[in-house]
Structures are given as structure tokens and as C-alpha cells.
Amino acid sequence: MAPKAFFVCLPWVLPRHALIVRQAGNPYHFLAYTNPRAPGKLQDSHCPVFFMGIIIITIITVTLAIIIINIIFLTLFDDGMCFYCSLLTFSFVSFNFDHFDHFDL
């Protein structure tokens, strides 16, 4: 198994001793971890690795949501970006001061 496997270490995502193993001819990636009692041996956790796909899908979804929200606010309000930024930073005071000219005082 070891000569046919391709190992990629992801220490920032996976816990200690964890590796992603891809066997030759196998399209699926499986999570395996090194056995501290037997160095060089891999112990399969029998768990397909879906978390990388979930992370990528989450990043794409959040990015698209931010773009869509920006487009909506820019089309509904004349200075939509300022309004959207004030929503993000919760600086409603500066938003209100900037928009006094819209009201008849």
C-alpha cells in the first residue's frame, strides 16, 4: 500500500499524525493517520475526506453572497456601498450623519 500511495500532509487542517492518502487508480481520497506505535505504517480511519470540499464550497458561497449583497445594495441605494459598509461595521452614527441631506430638517 505504501509504495502506491501518494501522501500530502495538511498540518493546518488535519490533526497531528493525519495524512491524506490517495492510492493509485483510486479516485477517492481517504483520511488515514500514522500509527505512533508502528512508525511507517498507516491506519485507515475508514472516513472519506469531504471536509476540503466543504471548505471550498463554503468559501465560494460566502464570496458569491457578498457580491450579490453588494449588487443589491448598489442598485437599491444611491450610495449602496457606504450603506453596506456601515452595516458591516455597525457604524450607524456615521451612516446617519452622511444621510442628513436626504431629509428635510
Swiss-Prot record:
Main subcellular location of this protein, as a coarse class: membrane
Zinc in keyword set: no
GO cellular component, one term: membrane
Keyword field: Membrane, Transmembrane, Transmembrane helix
Transmembrane regions: 49-69, 71-91
Compartment(s) where it occurs, according to its Swiss-Prot or TrEMBL record: Membrane
Topology relative to the membrane: Multi-pass membrane protein
Residue intervals annotated with topology Cytoplasmic: 70
Record's signal peptide: none
Sequence ranges on the Extracellular membrane side: 1-48, 92-105
Superkingdom of the source species: Eukaryota
Additional remark text: Present with 521 molecules/cell in log phase SD medium.
Protein's name according to its UniProt entry: Uncharacterized membrane protein YIL054W
Organism: Saccharomyces cerevisiae (strain ATCC 204508 / S288c)
Higher taxonomy: Eukaryota, Fungi, Dikarya, Ascomycota, Saccharomycotina
